[in-house]
Amino acid sequence: MAPYPYKVQTTVPELQYENFDGAKFGYMFWPVQNGTNEVRGRVLLIHGFGEYTKIQFRLMDHLSLNGYESFTFDQRGAGVTSPGRSKGVTDEYHVFNDLEHFVEKNLSECKAKGIPLFMWGHSMGGGICLNYACQGKHKNEISGYIGSGPLIILHPHTMYNKPTQIIAPLLAKFLPRVRIDTGLDLKGITSDKAYRAFLGSDPMSVPLYGSFRQIHDFMQRGAKLYKNENNYIQKNFAKDKPVIIMHGQDDTINDPKGSEKFIQDCPSADKELKLYPGARHSIFSLETDKVFNTVFNDMKQWLDKHTTTEAKP
């Protein structure tokens, strides 16, 4: 297996476990470790399809160095939460029920510390994040939303053919737990050869299994945002909450046009879309250091701008 290319500068926290609703979730809380240990806020990270905690180490490390705590968990169907044949097995109900559990856990801790909680989601997690901003139980208690290459619509390069689109709902209904290897598009994910080598040899990442139900549900979740039927976004988006979407302009997995349309439809007075020329799909976790440094700096500036409370010791 090729090594993880990034050298973590802080101390990697231990993976922790928590039982909830029939699953044993692996999660990680990364505290601020920057000399002063003053905390400006916390970011709850929602990973993409088939990802897990280690994929977020570079982002979490940088957040820590810049005064932000972070929290992420391996979703049902991914990582240590769902090993072996349970990988890829989940559905819409569990996605949001599980998320509400961890949102409540983090909100409780952040309120006790007097710090804001932001939500960040990448790809499939970006679609979850933006839908949470519209339908989440605690959507108005989150201080802001950040989407990274969110799954709203697939890029034509990745979109499956019409016959498959037609049969997908039937497969999800009658064979929900049947899994397929969807294939990992390494060139679409990143232009960095070292990260490609790591990901392509990582047993936690390949094969990239998804169940018919999981795949159907995350596609419908994105379509809900893109179609925006009955002004779903305008009527439901968290009141007065800021949102930023950051998307690689050369992303051939999730189409940047989906992000553009969401920002157009979103009623927030504080909304922003940043497109990055030359950047592919995984701009925070797996792209080149040059791309990462640019997007992280933009994210940090956005967080700093929206952090009204003074840093807490």
Swiss-Prot record:
GO terms for biological process?
Answer: triglyceride catabolic process; triglyceride metabolic process
One of the record's GO cellular component terms: membrane
Where is the protein situated, by its record's location annotation? Lipid droplet; Cytoplasm; Endoplasmic reticulum; Mitochondrion outer membrane
What SUPFAM superfamilies does the annotation carry?
Answer: alpha/beta-Hydrolases (SSF53474)
InterPro entries to which the protein is assigned, alphabetical: AB_hydrolase_fold, Hydrolase_4, MAG_DAG_Lipase
Which family does the entry's similarity section mention?
Answer: Belongs to the AB hydrolase superfamily. Monoacylglycerol lipase family.
| Top-level taxon | Eukaryota
Kindly give the Pfam families that the UniProt entry links to this protein.
Hydrolase_4 (PF12146)
Report the gene name.
YJU3
Which species? Saccharomyces cerevisiae (strain ATCC 204508 / S288c)
Protein name per Swiss-Prot or TrEMBL: Monoglyceride lipase
Role:
Converts monoacylglycerides (MAG) to free fatty acids and glycerol. Has a strong preference for monounsaturated monoglycerides. Required for efficient degradation of MAG, short-lived intermediates of glycerolipid metabolism which may also function as lipid signaling molecules. Controls inactivation of the signaling lipid N-palmitoylethanolamine (PEA). Involved in fatty acid ethyl ester (FAEE) catabolism. FAEEs are non-oxidative metabolites of ethanol that are transiently incorporated into lipid droplets (LDs).
**Catalytic center at which residues?**
S123, D251, H281
Task: Summarize the pH-dependence annotation from the UniProt entry.
Answer: Active from pH 4.5 to 8.
Keyword Nucleotidyltransferase tagged: no
Keywords, ordered alphabetically: Cytoplasm, Endoplasmic reticulum, Hydrolase, Lipid droplet, Membrane, Mitochondrion, Mitochondrion outer membrane
